[in-house]
Swiss-Prot record:
Pathway: Cell wall biogenesis; peptidoglycan biosynthesis. It is found in: Secreted. Residues 393-406 have a biased composition (Basic and acidic residues). This is D-alanyl-D-alanine carboxypeptidase. The active site is at S93. It comes from Streptomyces sp. (strain R61). Belongs to the peptidase S12 family. It catalyses: Preferential cleavage: (Ac)2-L-Lys-D-Ala-|-D-Ala. Also transpeptidation of peptidyl-alanyl moieties that are N-acyl substituents of D-alanine.
Length: 406
């Protein structure tokens, strides 16, 4: 173990690095074609994120049973408690991958057709019968993202909804006030509205809450003991990292945004988890443990986002500088940035978290954890490529994607 301290104001920061050897399963030796994770590079990313305004940051890499864990800074600015990789946090839009898994399991069970109209299952919900389940799950429905209105002003918008409880229909109504942004299937346009519809589909087809379906289909089978869906409760259970929202105004004081209902997101963004549980989840997903091979292939039918990113069905693909593609999701919710991705075979996974948001510099810096985790120590050429590709990271796409903040 390597440890040290980093000062940040009056709060104590901590750096942790641990390598834990865990017996690998038979026939699942670490993928030989992946370079070893670059722990020095990971630590540098966390240090940079703190210098850019994050109170704390952490990353956990599961390399086929060998665990790399690093953390720096604080979980709680008031007490100075150091952040650790066991702290729970709000995962934001990583929730979309959980919702997508449930829907694809329902396809496997013959209860859902990806190419059927959403209105087949939820009559009259959407203004166009041509909008399909597949288009909703791939952000090609044209449904306007209501969070653009909610969070046009970051802190006032958050304070106006932090204790509110919305119904799914409330959120759909907010979206439909604007009409659609494009014809069904015509374009990729990220919208939280799509995964509100996903939650409605889950509840209609199963007769259960999304909380029950997440628990029975994912949390319990994978033994995700740090993962919860507590909406509309405002408290994160157990030991957790506090979240700190950066105001739009330069130099404004960070706002403790830890406690909120997240009712504005629900099945689009209200899950709570940990680095270990998200690593476990995406490893299980990519190794085929959560659905049939046919549905996993459907999940990976990509729509182009930009030159280095694609979006499937509740799943992101990122193409890294070393030629490796990784699969998972990003998450932004007030006070938390999350990156959670795995290799194609699920044998290596990484989850990175900074406990701030509305800070584009931290957002783009934390994306570099993927390069260090999957591409290893950079050559000069890789370093130039990684630096260039960092500028293409989506900026605040997971929340209020239509609002420019930088």
């Amino acid at each position: 173990m390597v440890s040290g301290t980093v000062g940040r104001g009056t709060a104590l920061g901590a750096v942790l690095l641990a390598l834990l050897a865990v017996p690998a399963q038979a026939g699942t030796a670490a993928a030989a074609d992946l370079p070893a994770p670059d722990d020095t590079g990971l630590q540098a990313v966390l240090h940079t994120a703190l210098s850019q305004g994050a109170p704390g940051a952490m990353v956990r890499v599961d390399d086929n049973g060998t665990i790399h864990q690093l953390s720096e800074g604080v979980a709680d600015r008031a007490t100075g408690r150091a952040i650790t990789t066991t702290d729970r946090f709000r995962v934001g839009s990583v929730t979309k991958s959980f919702s997508a898994v449930v829907l694809l399991q329902l396809v496997d069970e013959g209860k859902l057709d990806l190419d059927a109209s959403v209105n087949t299952y939820l009559p009259g919900l959407l203004p166009d019968d041509r909008i399909t389940v597949r288009q909703v799950m791939s952000h090609r429905s044209g449904l306007y993202d209501y969070t653009n209105d909610m969070f046009a002003q970051t802190v006032p918008g958050f304070e106006s909804v932090r204790n509110k409880v919305f119904s799914y229909q409330d959120l759909i109504t907010l979206s439909l006030k604007h009409g659609v942004t494009n014809a069904p299937g015509a374009a990729y346009s990220y919208s939280n509205t799509n995964f509100v519809v996903a939650g409605m589909l889950i509840e209609k087809l199963t007769g259960h809450s999304v909380a029950t379906e997440y628990q029975n289909r994912i949390f319990t089978p994978l033994n995700l003991t740090d993962t919860f869906y507590v909406h509309p409760d405002t408290v994160i259970p157990g030991t957790h990292a506090n979240g700190y929202l950066t105001p739009d105004e330069a130099g404004g004081a960070l706002v403790d945004s830890t406690e909120q209902t997240v009712s504005w997101a629900q099945s689009a963004g209200a899950v709570i988890s940990s680095t270990q549980d998200l690593d476990t989840f995406f490893s299980a997903l990519m190794s085929g443990q959560l659905m049939s091979a046919a549905q996993l292939a459907q999940m990976q039918q990509w729509t182009t986002v930009n030159s280095t990113q694609g979006y499937g069905l509740g799943l992101r693909r990122r193409d890294l500088s070393c030629g490796i593609s990784v699969y998972g999701h990003t998450g932004t919710v007030q006070g938390y940035y999350t990156y959670a991705f795995a290799s194609k075979d699920g044998k290596r996974s990484v989850t990175a978290l900074a406990n701030t948001s509305n800070n584009v510099n931290v957002l783009n810096t934390m994306a570099r954890t993927l390069e260090s985790a999957f591409c290893g120590k950079p050559t000069t050429a890789k370093l130039r490529s990684a630096t260039s590709s960092a500028t293409t990271v989506e900026r605040h796409e997971d929340i209020a994607p239509g609002i420019a903040r930088d």
